Amino acid sequence: MKVVIGLGNPGKKYEKTRHNIGFIAVDNLRKKFNISDEREKFQALVSEKNIDGEKVIFFKPQTFMNLSGNSVIEIINFYKLDPKKDIIVIYDDMDLSFGDIRIREKGSSGGHNGIKSIISHIGEEFIRIKCGIGAKERDAVEHVLGEFNQTEQKDLDEILEKINNCVIEMLSVQNLDRIMQKYNKKKEISK
């Protein structure tokens, strides 16, 4: 079993913000796999699909970003998951250029409060896909809680497709090093 976790904040107010790229990516994956049902469980919105013979749960914590770990630990404990190999967390990263993604097997929170919350519950060893939202000269909170601008919006579909492909490979291929080599590059978005 795998759990694909997208981080974000619940509610209409936040749904199109940069900070919600994890929710947006999970919703895009659900669309790709034709999953329409979503239910509340583990303080999250949860949907599932059997993909290549393995149960995959798509998971969006509804605790608000800073408390994401409270939700994540519930599903890990319920299914007795090994965070090192059974979960993939997708979230925004201001330190990466917009459109870049980085896959990591472990590490610190990098100042991301959602990741900090998860680490406080399960430790630093879990697979994560960091999605670059760029750093702006303005206030960090204003930037992450701001909506994608027109230029970013034009590239968003292509970025989400890259994230889709990355997650699909992670679900079917066991060689994470090869996947990291392929995707941990500067963005290659067509203009």
From Swiss-Prot:
Question: Which residue positions does UniProt flag as site: Stabilizes the basic form of H active site to accept a proton?
Answer: D92
Q: Where does tRNA bind?
A: Y14, F64, N66, N113
Q: Which SUPFAM superfamilies does the UniProt record give?
A: Peptidyl-tRNA hydrolase-like
Select a single GO molecular function from the record's annotations and give it. Answer: tRNA binding
PROSITE patterns (UniProt xref): PEPT_TRNA_HYDROL_1, PEPT_TRNA_HYDROL_2
What's any one GO cellular component for it?
Answer: cytoplasm
Keywords on record: Cytoplasm, Hydrolase, RNA-binding, tRNA-binding
Alphabetized InterPro entries for the sequence: Pept_tRNA_hydro (IPR001328), Pept_tRNA_hydro_CS (IPR018171), Pept_tRNA_hydro_sf (IPR036416)
Indicate the residues that form the catalytic site: H19
Q: What does the record note on quaternary structure?
A: Monomer.
Q: Which family does it belong to?
A: Belongs to the PTH family.
**Record's protein name:** Peptidyl-tRNA hydrolase
